[in-house]
A protein has these predicted regions:
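Helical element adjacent to the flavin cofactor pocket in flavoenzyme catalytic cores
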Residues: 127-164, 171, 175-182, 317-325
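Dinucleotide-binding Rossmann-like beta1-alpha1 core, especially the glycine-rich loop
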Residues: 45-123
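Active-site lid/adjacent beta-loop-alpha segment flanking the redox-cofactor pocket in flavoenzymes
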Residues: 211-296
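N-terminal Rossmann-like FAD-binding beta1-loop-alpha1 element of flavoenzymes
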Residues: 3-28
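Central helical "cap/lid" subdomain
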Residues: 37, 171-214, 254-255, 271-272
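C-terminal catalytic lobe of FAD-dependent flavoproteins
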Residues: 269-330
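Helix-loop-beta segment of a Rossmann-like dinucleotide-binding subdomain
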Residues: 79-89, 113-147, 303-311
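Glycine-rich FAD pyrophosphate-binding loop
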Residues: 23-42
Length: 330
């Protein structure tokens, strides 16, 4: 007889987990919104990480490298590659150009040094690398189709306030990302340590660098990403010290940091022309003691079949499967 499994959160990780488990279990996903992939899954920059962005965190870089190919194969129809990706080493970077080169070569990364034609003297070296983005609409369509084919049930507009509301299920998986610790506390369970949750901003804009994405490393600079054609030329830009520190006005509305980030971008690229479009805001959770962005799977106790899954980069969903298999026979 097939056992029943509950998953809290119909984001990318929750949907992938539901499809993974559906071969052996009856799966029900509980989602408090009226659609899937509306929160953290939609706030990511859509960059398919190869590890280039993490020269100071080999654990994250290696995890990205390991899961890159499985993601590319799994979602081949959603991959976008019609742009150039530039990595620029800032003059006051946490890593020198030599250190960056040593790390990337040891990881087997594909890149080449190019002439600095657009950056100011705040950049010492520029590298062109092979990087990709993805179309979230296509990925969403793929996952919903597979959920339907595997009879994964999704309960929309259903907020789970206490995990023991789901005590009639044989196993419970928490995939609600930034809200996991709140749910654990409400359930009388121990929250995940060293996790910081905060409101983050995703800025959508246009510039005159056609089909060029830029990442300035390593420090509090900025990272841009080209988007699929359906976004009509829009790009996204983030800068952790700005987009992860959001203020609220007297009316309770989030205040965008785009003007400060645009000023920074002009310091590095003097001739850039910038046009703000809009921003999206949402909760984000990270390891507050390091910039490690790997996936973590934790069983809440030996006598409870409750599992917390804290997603990392989007490709790291494949390491979630490995960790689950190591915990039990799923």
């Amino acid at each position: 007889m097939r056992k029943d499994v509950a998953i809290v959160g119909a984001g990318f990780y929750g949907l992938m987990l539901g499809i993974f488990l559906a071969d052996r279990y009856n799966v029900t996903i509980f989602e408090e919104e009226n659609d899937v992939m509306t929160k953290a899954s939609s706030l990511c920059q859509m960059r398919i990480h190869t590890g280039m962005m993490y020269p100071t965190n080999l654990q994250t870089a290696l995890s990205c490298i390991k899961t890159f190919k499985p993601f590319m194969v799994r979602f081949k129809s959603a991959i976008v590659d019609n742009f150039t990706s530039l990595y620029a080493i800032a003059s006051d970077s946490k890593v020198s150009c030599e250190e960056f080169l040593t790390v990337q070569k040891s990881l087997g990364q594909k890149f080449k040094r190019i002439d600095n034609t657009i950056f100011s003297n705040r950049v010492t070296d520029v590298f062109k690398c092979e990087e990709f983005t993805f179309d979230p609409v296509i990925i969403k369509s793929i996952l919903l189709k597979e959920c339907s084919e595997k009879n994964v049930k999704i309960e929309f507009n259903h907020k789970v306030n206490n995990v023991f509301e789901l005590s009639n299920f044989d196993k419970i998986f928490l995939c609600n990302y930034a809200e996991i610790n709140s749910l654990l506390r409400n359930s009388g369970l121990t929250p995940i340590e060293n996790v910081s949750s905060f409101v983050t901003e995703k800025i959508f804009y246009r510039d005159n660098l056609d089909n060029v994405a830029v990442c300035v490393i390593d420090g509090n600079y900025f990272s841009t990403m080209c988007l699929p054609e359906r976004f009509n030329g829009l790009k996204t830009v983030t800068g952790a010290d700005i987009t992860n520190n959001i203020s609220i006005d007297s009316n309770g509305k989030y205040i965008s940091g785009y003007q400060r980030l645009f000023a920074r971008m002009r310091e590095f690229i003097p001739d850039i022309e910038l046009e703000y479009d809009h921003s999206e805001f949402g909760l984000k959770s990270v390891n507050k003691n390091s910039n490690c962005r790997t996936c973590m799977v934790r069983k809440e106790s030996f006598d409870l079949n409750i599992y917390s899954i804290m997603g990392g980069k989007i490709t790291n969903v494949f390491s979630m499967f490995d960790q689950l298999k190591n915990l039990e026979k799923f």
